[in-house]
Amino acid sequence: MFDVLMYLFETYIHNEAELRVDQDRLERDLTDAGFDREDIYNALLWLEKLADYQDGLAEPMQLASDPLSMRIYTVEECERLDASCRGFLLFLEQIQVLNLETREMVIERVLALDTAEFDLEDLKWVILMVLFNIPGCENAYQQMEELLFEVNEGMLH
């Protein structure tokens, strides 16, 4: 499923392709690209839930906005998000790429993935997808994109 999400994000969203693609056509394109039907269905459902945030149909948990509060992760969250992922989320909050609400959206979308393996690089892409879909997060998206591609480009040299 995560591979389908990455393909969709890179092909349609990140490259600013036509976003209003017919779902049947999109499913055909993904099937033609070699993706499994169940993975396609799960990825589209995942994106639908993400779009609910954009449309205001879903809201993250109501959170205390005390700047001194600290996020305690559940066992399930710790199993999916290792220490480096949790540290990266904290870092993004500290530099104000994420706020309490967008952090919770990211965590919720990570937990909704049906993948056995999940690492820091995967988390960065989920963060980009979430920020891209939330109105008013354009600057945060741009900062996150710079962080992601700046680090990756530096690794190539």
Swiss-Prot record:
InterPro entries: Smg
A Pfam family it matches: DUF494
Coiled-coil portions: none
Highest taxon, organism lineage: Bacteria
PANTHER family, A to Z: PROTEIN SMG (PTHR38692:SF1)
NCBIfam families with a match to the protein in the record: PRK03430.1
Entries under HAMAP family matching the protein: Smg (MF_00598)
Record-stated family: Belongs to the Smg family.
Protein name from the UniProt record: Protein Smg
Source species: Salmonella typhimurium (strain LT2 / SGSC1412 / ATCC 700720)
Gene assigned in the entry: smg
